[in-house]
């Protein structure tokens, strides 16, 4: 039976960063991946990555075609498309990736650091011993089933969270998430007849008739290619994403006679982070821990950040002794301080968007109750103030939209409350339960006041 210091389940962006970070410090690391090596990196997503994530992680810009298109920001279209917010800031400068090449680039970095890879190998179940996760049972492409022992197992298996779902209840890790916190997505890569005029910005379209609780995206790729897709919240009786895509998006003139290059569907956990992401001998990263921006659904940057922070924490824990939940707890603190606070606050803003009508959003954007600067500050996790003048109040009262105005004010207030709550994230598991109970209270308040 092979023994490792760290066993990473999943060779995605989070898994490769966790493996690379741990292996660079001399730990014996193995990545288990169900895909063939050549297919690592292939994933259904928007393929966008902010440049600041590479900078923060100390990664140079890859030069082998991994960065397919530079973008300068995001344009958000109101449901009636009469108002467009252009969000252009250094933190919104980024790239549309060649997803497979980028995944291969990260895998190579993990391998060069010393990580081993078992591709075409399926995770079956975690191994337990005396309250610790101590490895995994896996099956390779020949059908052989065997066990791998490790001091720490990292669940980097994405939305399916194959390790998390099989953990025991005494680890205080949520094994399931609500459907209403997930977006069902459908995406295509298409070759247009000619290149779009706007190739500097990623475009986001709000329209509850097309994408209830979600949005449509059109992201420019190299030449006349685009990444186009949509997501709908899995709340109640939600529509099928592919059907919505072909009924509404493909009806646009710009897609007439376009060529389908690639298509696929997947799920995106758009909510706050899991309240706790560590247990004895186990750490959760990336989509497996619901580490995705709740507003735009981007998860590549947060996943890489979490992988790096998890790897760093695992190294420190093993240097000091056993990888207990307490020893690994610092990963929770690192992520919550760097991105989790913002993510949780944006989850409240997501509730506002889901609970608002298209008419409310049209008026709100047109009247500049929420401005481009507000959206930018919210996206960066900064405080912002609503531009609610007496004139705006009269307009909304006259159009019988004071309810939306009230919701907007409440949203800003609750985002601040959630931010302050995450600033007080416990520094050890002993103080976790009271914090978790308060989290649940805030979330339920948000749902009751903004969604219902």
Spans of model-derived segments:
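Short beta-strand to alpha-helix junction loop
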Residues: 89-108, 233-241
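FAD/FMN-dependent oxidoreductases across multiple families
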Residues: 123, 236-313, 318-319, 325-338, ...
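Beta1/beta-strand and adjacent pyrophosphate-binding region of the FAD-binding site
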Residues: 1-14
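N-terminal FAD cofactor-binding segment of flavoenzymes
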Residues: 36-75
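Glycine-rich FAD pyrophosphate-binding loop
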Residues: 7, 23-43
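C-terminal helical "tail/cap" subdomain of flavin- and related membrane-associated enzymes
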Residues: 315-452
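Predominantly flavin-linked oxidoreductase catalytic cores and closely associated redox partners
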Residues: 109-255, 290
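Glycine-rich phosphate/pyrophosphate-binding beta-alpha loops
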Residues: 43-46, 93-96, 215, 289-301
């Amino acid at each position: 039976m092979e023994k490792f210091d760290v066993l990473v389940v999943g060779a995605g962006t989070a898994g490769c960063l966790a493996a690379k970070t741990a292996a660079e410090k001399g730990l014996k690391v193995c990545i288990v991946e169900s895909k063939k090596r050549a297919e690592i990196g292939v994933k259904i997503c928007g393929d966008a990555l902010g440049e600041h994530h590479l900078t923060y992680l100390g990664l140079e810009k890859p030069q082998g075609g991994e960065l397919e298109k530079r973008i300068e920001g995001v344009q958000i279209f109101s449901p009636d498309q009469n108002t467009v917010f252009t969000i252009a800031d250094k933190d919104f400068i980024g790239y549309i990736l060649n997803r497979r090449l980028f995944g291969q680039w990260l895998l190579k970095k993990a391998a060069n650091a010393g990580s081993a890879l078992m591709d075409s190998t399926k995770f079956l179940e975690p191994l337990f011993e005396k309250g610790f996760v101590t490895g995994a049972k896996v099956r390779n492409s020949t059908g052989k089933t065997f066990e791998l022992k490790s001091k720490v197992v990292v669940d980097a298996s994405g939305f399916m969270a194959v390790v998390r779902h099989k953990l025991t209840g005494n680890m205080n890790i949520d094994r399931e998430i609500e459907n209403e916190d997930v977006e069902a997505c459908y995406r295509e890569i298409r070759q247009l007849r000619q290149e779009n005029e706007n190739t500097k910005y990623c475009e986001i379209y709000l329209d509850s008739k097309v994408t209830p609780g979600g949005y449509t995206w059109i992201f420019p790729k190299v030449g006349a290619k685009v990444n186009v897709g949509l997501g709908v919240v899995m709340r109640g009786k939600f529509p099928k994403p592919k059907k919505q895509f072909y009924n509404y998006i493909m009806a646009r003139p710009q897609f007439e006679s376009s060529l389908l290059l690639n298509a696929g569907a997947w799920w995106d956990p758009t909510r706050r982070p899991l309240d706790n992401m560590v247990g004895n001998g186990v750490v959760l990263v990336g989509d497996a821990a619901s580490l995705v921006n709740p507003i735009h659904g981007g998860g590549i940057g947060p996943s890489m950040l979490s992988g790096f922070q998890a790897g760093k924490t695992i190294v420190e824990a093993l240097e000091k002794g056993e990888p207990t939940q307490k020893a690994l707890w610092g990963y929770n603190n690192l992520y919550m301080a760097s991105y989790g606070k913002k993510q949780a606050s944006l989850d409240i803003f997501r509730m506002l968007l889901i609970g608002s009508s298209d008419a409310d959003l049209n008026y709100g954007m047109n009247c500049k109750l929420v401005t481009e600067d507000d959206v930018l500050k919210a996206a960066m996790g900064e405080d912002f103030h609503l531009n609610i003048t007496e004139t705006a109040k009269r307009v909304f009262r006259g159009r019988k939209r004071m309810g939306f105005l009230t919701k907007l004010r409440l949203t800003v207030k609750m985002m601040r409350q959630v931010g302050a709550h995450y600033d007080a994230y416990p520094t050890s598991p002993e103080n976790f339960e009271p914090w978790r109970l308060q989290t649940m209270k805030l979330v339920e308040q948000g749902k009751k006041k903004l969604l219902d």
